[in-house]
Amino acid sequence: MREADFIASHTSRDGVIRMPSSHTGRIRVLTMITSFHIGGTERQVTNVSLGLDRTRFDLHLACMRDIGELKRELDGVLNIPRPVFDIGSLYSFRTLKQAKRLARYIRDNGIHVVHTYGLYPNIFAVPVARLAGAPIVIASIRDCGDILKPWQRRAQKTICALADCVLVNADAIRDTLIKQGYRAEKIAVIRNAVTPANRAGSLAEPGIRAEMGWDSNAPVVIVLSRLNRMKGIEYFLEAAKLVGQRIAAARFLVIGDGAIKRELQDRASALGLADKVIFTGFRTDVGRLLQQANLSVLPSLSEGLSNALLESMAAGVPVIATSVGGNPEVVEDGVSGLLVPPKDPTSLADAMLTLLEKPALAARYAAAGSQRIDEMFSVKQSVARIESLYRQLVDGPNYVPLEAAPVENFFES
């Protein structure tokens, strides 16, 4: 290796030349999320938490609000401390107290890696971890930021500059961050993953149709989504009306909850779809519903890398998605599903009609999609990549043992 290359590869964030870390033993990781409500980020953190090799990693799983359905999956897992740092608001006095608690927790437990997921954990915990002397800090960004306010994007960019690594789950997010001025060499991409699905369900099973009061042979189209502006559900409803004009028996399920649920229900009624579209709210049996669906649609206006898309493909359901964010990284258009432009009900309806009227083509896409998930988006692969990233950073030039790191007097008071 040339001297210049050696210096470049062993120069830390403060400009000091260091040899790789000789850290041995288990790596202690503190992960922080907002809550345990079911969502893409929370599901991925749960998957990693359950999958990390306990002989090599000692996981601490922190949150800001100790609520959510995924807690039950973790309750049976032994030896995972789950501290809560309830700040209430970033601007409250409580935030200062919780910051001191977090800094003390990092030092008292000898944490090697602090890994935050999402806007508020990033803004709160990254600077605290840095000031507390955490050897490695990773900030995760899980979407393209279209839903964020300008000040939130600026704040997150400033905070993430303090991290050793910014972890994203799609190339599209990486490209967006680079355009916003993030340093490309600090960004790593590890895509979302799903567990293998039970594909034994049959469209002939009456369960979902009987439950909804529909004909046993009705074609069923599903949308799995949080109900907010960026999910494009209003365009799906317009497309559903067009589909219903040609396939009168078609029925539509919108599975999920959110702030605009009532508005969307009113929109469905205004379109004459009250008897064809059902908003189920939150469901814990998504797998069963998917097994009996003919088609899954993701009409988003913006995406990172959609768990709903992965889950649908893993279940062997043909998919249609908008060509935004990380969707083209999951769906190969015309091979493992169909991609359509966002905000285009006509194109979406045409794609839905194509797959509903050509079941052999839909089955071919479904088989290719489930194979793609098995090969590229397994939880085992994702966990292995996370473990490799942790090891790489701990062995890298930025690693400073916690005992040797300077600590701000503020956190010692």
Sequence positions of predicted segments:
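Aromatic "clamp/platform" in nucleotide-sugar-dependent glycosyltransferases that forms part
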Residues: 282, 301
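A conserved, positively charged/aromatic
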Residues: 138-167, 180
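Short hydrophobic beta-strand element within catalytic cores of glycosyltransferases
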Residues: 318-321, 331
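A conserved mid-protein helix/loop that constitutes part of the nucleotide-sugar donor-binding site
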Residues: 42-50, 219-245, 252, 259-266, ...
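Short His-centered aromatic/hydrophobic patch
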Residues: 116-124, 141
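N-terminal strand-loop element at the rim of the active site
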Residues: 6, 20-27, 31-39, 43-97, ...
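A short, active-site helix/loop in glycosyltransferases that binds the activated sugar's phosphate group
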Residues: 163-189, 194-198
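Conserved acidic donor-binding segment of nucleotide-sugar-dependent glycosyltransferases
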Residues: 333-334, 338-345, 354-359
